[in-house]
Amino acid sequence: MVSQLTDAFARTFYYLRLSVTDVCNFRCTYCLPGGYRPDSHGAKRFLSCDEIRRISHAFAALGTEKVRLTGGEPTLRRDFCDIVAAVRENSAIRTLAVTTNGYRMARDVGAWRDAGLTAINVSVDSLDARQFHAITGEDRFAQVMAGIDAAFDAGFGRIKVNTVLMRGVNDGSLQAFLHWIRRRPIQMRFIELMETGDGSELFRRHHVSGATIRTQLLAAGWQRRLPGRSDGPAQVFWHPDYLGEVGLIMPYEKNFCASCNRLRVSAVGNLHLCLFGEQGIALRDLLQEDAQQAALQVRIAAALRHKREGHFLHQGDSGHTQNLSFIGG
């Protein structure tokens, strides 16, 4: 039996990003500007709670320590708390996180924590309510801010906030974000805009390197923090005068893929070795019975033989990723 997921480049995989739906109720300009549209084959049958439980059990047995539930908007699923509880059945999973647009946080975050959720990432691309509305297509800024407060009240000690960095949109907002996190335990994460199949023109207009933010941080006395083995790819910076931190995710940086530690499973049960990779390796046929666990683990481990050393974004190759709701970014 395979005991640990390792690829041909000696990278070990402790982190699973598990999409539970493609559906999202926001219309973010960099992801789903026209809103969610079912494909021509009709409504997809997303992974059931039992299938998710079997996936998480297999990955936990293969050394996974961290699972992040993604989408789409994962909290739109009516059984979201059941999904959280199913993943938390695995004691080897030390961190169970969600990436959310925050739409339901104010109402439901306490229930998520009670079910076993341990970490939250919230997408907030602007601290200006009008600009937030323009980016997301939803006038929900106050609601999302209330949700962040509710998460702290529910007992989450630190929250991560994701901001997609866009030239001419929010790249001049660093000081506003830093002021916001000065007395709040928030890790502010600036994510470089990435080119996808549907977003090439947006990328050409708005991409800006996260290095511009890094230069400003270092000049202001911020210091780099070393990552843990199940952390994501962010370069994290701290400052003694701030409760919050800043993370930079820069996929176009040299050697970005050298420390890759995550795999992805789509909402229909395909294993993706890279966000910008192949069409995926089907797992769903091995998710129907608990007795299939050994075969499932063997298939997952065998797939790693095909993982490439890096992506090809610099050549404009985004693989089969049409938009970031497809396998959860």
Swiss-Prot record:
[4Fe-4S] cluster 2 binds at C257, C260, C274. GTP binds at R17, R68, T99, K160, R262, L263, R264. Its cofactor is [4Fe-4S] cluster. Residues 8-229 form the Radical SAM core domain. [4Fe-4S] cluster 1 binds at C24, C28, C31. It catalyses: GTP + AH2 + S-adenosyl-L-methionine = (8S)-3',8-cyclo-7,8-dihydroguanosine 5'-triphosphate + 5'-deoxyadenosine + L-methionine + A + H(+). S-adenosyl-L-methionine binds at Y30, G72, S123, M194. HAMAP family: MoaA_B. Belongs to the radical SAM superfamily. MoaA family. This is GTP 3',8-cyclase. It comes from Edwardsiella ictaluri (strain 93-146). The gene is moaA.
